[in-house]
Amino acid sequence: MIRLIMKNLWARRRKNGWLLAELILVSIVTWVIVDPLVVLTHDRNLPEGYRPDHLFLLQLASYPAGSEQFRAEENDTLARKANFERLLNKLKHYEGVKYTTFILNEQYPSALSISNGNTMFDTIPVRTLRLAFIPHTDYFRTMGMEGAEGMTAEQLDNRDFLWTESVLTADISQRLKDGKPLYGRRLGNGDEEDYRVGGVIAPVRYRSYMQPMPIELYVYEEFPDYMYYYIPLIALRIDDHLSEKVFLHHFREWMNKELTVGNYYVKSVQSFSDIQEQHEFSEGITNQYRLNLALGIFFLVNLCLGVAGTFWMQTRSRREEVGIMLSFGGTPSHITRLLLYEGW
C-alpha cells in the first residue's frame, strides 16, 4: 500500500503542491490572528493580585471660590480637616461598606497614569511601578490584595510602617534570582539611609490585559495637610453578597444628599470593573480582541470547509480510479484507508 500511495502522490505532485502551499498560507494567516488572541486570553486569566469586584472609586472635589455653594468660613485648613473627617465617617458607616482607603497620586491598578523607577538592591536595579499608601487605612484589605511570604492583608494593614520601608510584590524576587525572601531585605545602593522591605504581597496585574509587573508601594506616614486641598481619591469595598448595580443606584442617591460637607462633595463614583472595561476600550484592547476573535472563527470555519471540500473534490475526481480498484478486488475499507493515508 505504501508503494501505491507514493506513486499516487508523485503522479499528482503538481496538484498536491498547490494544496500544500494553500495549507501553509492558511496556517500562517491563522497563526497571526490566533497568536495575540491566545496571549491576551492567557494574560486575562492570570491572577490579578487584587479584587476589582465589589470595589468602587470615589472622586471628591471642592466648590471653587466663585461658586454659589462655596462657604468661605469652611475653607481654612482646620475646617477642611474637620469636614473631611466627617465625610469619611459618613462613608465608613454607610450600610454595606466594609473598608475604605485613600488612593494617592491618582495611581491604582487600571489607572491611566503610571509612576515608575528603579528599586535598588545594593547594586542591582529592578524596574518597578510605584504606588503610595498610608498605614492603618485598610489599604490592602480594601484593594483585596493578597499577602505573601507568610503575611496577610490584615497584618499589613495593622503594621506600623516607617517611611523608610516599602511593600514589594513577590515577583521581584524572580528578577533577583538569588532565591532569598524579600521581607527584611535592605534597599538602596549602600550610601543612603536604611531603607528596607517591610512587607510582601502577591504579584499584581496593573493592567487587566497584561501580565503582572513588579510594584513597589512606598509609605506616607501620615495624611499631609495639603491633601485637604489636593484631594485624594477614595476607594471603598462593599460586602460580597451585595449587587454592585443595586448598591451604586442607592449610593448615588444618598451621596448627593449626605456627602456634601462644607465645601466638599462627591464628583463621581465608579466601579473598578467599569474602570477596567473603559481603560481596555480606550487602549483599543477590546476592539482588537473582538476583531481577532471574529477573524479567528471566520478562518477556522473556512479552513474546515476548505479541507472538507478539497477531500470531496479529490474523491469525486477519482471515481474512475476507485471503480477500477473495486473491479480488481479492492474493498471499500481498503480504498478509504488509502485515501486517508494519502491525505495524511
PLM features: residue spans?
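Membrane-proximal extracellular/periplasmic loop immediately following the first transmembrane helix
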Residues: 36-127
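Solvent-exposed, non-transmembrane alpha-helical starts
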Residues: 67-82, 126-130, 160-163, 203-213, ...
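Hydrophobic secondary-structure segments that place a key small or acidic residue at a functional site
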Residues: 125-216
